[in-house]
Amino acid sequence: MKSLALTLGDPAGIGSEVILKALADPSVGENYNITVVGSRSLLEESYHQLRSLPHVNHSDLVDPANLLILDIPLDKTTKSQIQLGKGNAASGEASFTYLQAAIAGTLKGEFAGIVTAPIAKSCWKAAGYHYPGQTEVLAQAAGVEKFGMLFVARSPYTGWMLRTLLATTHIPLSQVPTVLTPELMTLKLELLIDCLKNDFRLDHPKIAIAGLNPHSGEQGQLGTEERDWLTPWLEEEKKRHCEVELVGLVPPDTMWVTPGQAWYGNAPHPQHGADGYLALYHDQGLIPVKLMAFDQAINTTIGLPFIRTSPDHGTAFDIAGKGIARPASMIEAIKLAQALVNG
């Protein structure tokens, strides 16, 4: 069985810590074939530094000597500039190099998929890499133009699965109404439908689609996008996708009531929640996701020719090296990647 590539992410952040903790978890370490992609020496240094902290249980960390590692050594100058908690051009260079190595191996068929630890976009920029994030690098390397950021989380209370796709991602809020078009919405909706059918094996999925403005525009009183084109667009999509239950446009302030009930077990039954949610911009989708599932949520890139997942948190420079980073999201990212690979 091919292994999953697991990148170290930004070495100044918590990537090494959550990886060492996630791979020490019995539910992962004993059941998954993982190749860590990054600097062996940096991972070993992180391991020994964390073990030196009095509050860290040694059994919560896997010894790097027991891991399969695709070693990406850093030159002395770059390595000397990397310091926990202080991301910079050197740490950005390292994380970009790790990602490129994982992509190259995956495209060659050496890995079954990729799980990425967090990077810092500011550090990439400092190193001369001007990408909005890892998603765009992956899409460019794979030669795909149609892709999306899907956030997935399984409720620890009910087992219900939340799946949220963003129509727009890392752009200023002021640009959202201009960037949103019928063509973009169709692209994202079709990506979500294909993912729900093919990856999650849902033959007749239910998808809820949010409005853009308060109260979905209140018939043009609070914004005209819904009246002018979003509602007509959705009506056409309902005709095109008879096998899918499309619900909307749901007012953004009530969009997340039903999934919240399904998540916490307050709905008559968990199936009250939709199978997928299409949010129109970053914070509209991710504020509720992180409120419900900060430790469980996973980012998976759909539309790629291979599986990619990542924990839904950042580099957390402020707590790097303190031994308090939680590995739950990384554990879930590994499990979902393997489940998707297995089909």
Curated annotation (Swiss-Prot):
Keyword Oxidoreductase: yes
Secreted is among the record's keywords: no
Binding site for substrate: T135, K290, N299, R308
UniProt GO BP: pyridoxal phosphate biosynthetic process; pyridoxine biosynthetic process
Cofactor annotation: a divalent metal cation
GO cellular component annotations of the record: cytoplasm
Record-listed E.C. numbers: 1.1.1.262
Biological pathway: Cofactor biosynthesis; pyridoxine 5'-phosphate biosynthesis; pyridoxine 5'-phosphate from D-erythrose 4-phosphate: step 4/5
Binding site for a divalent metal cation: H170, H215, H282
Catalysed transformations (reactions): 4-(phosphooxy)-L-threonine + NAD(+) = 3-amino-2-oxopropyl phosphate + CO2 + NADH
InterPro entries registered for this protein in UniProt: PdxA, PdxA_fam
Similarity-based family: Belongs to the PdxA family.
PANTHER family in the cross-refs: 4-HYDROXYTHREONINE-4-PHOSPHATE DEHYDROGENASE, D-THREONATE 4-PHOSPHATE DEHYDROGENASE
Protein's job: Catalyzes the NAD(P)-dependent oxidation of 4-(phosphooxy)-L-threonine (HTP) into 2-amino-3-oxo-4-(phosphooxy)butyric acid which spontaneously decarboxylates to form 3-amino-2-oxopropyl phosphate (AHAP).
Additional observations: The active site is located at the dimer interface.
Subunit structure comment from the entry: Homodimer.
Name this protein carries in UniProt: 4-hydroxythreonine-4-phosphate dehydrogenase
Record organism: Gloeothece citriformis (strain PCC 7424) (Cyanothece sp. (strain PCC 7424))
Gene from which this protein is expressed: pdxA
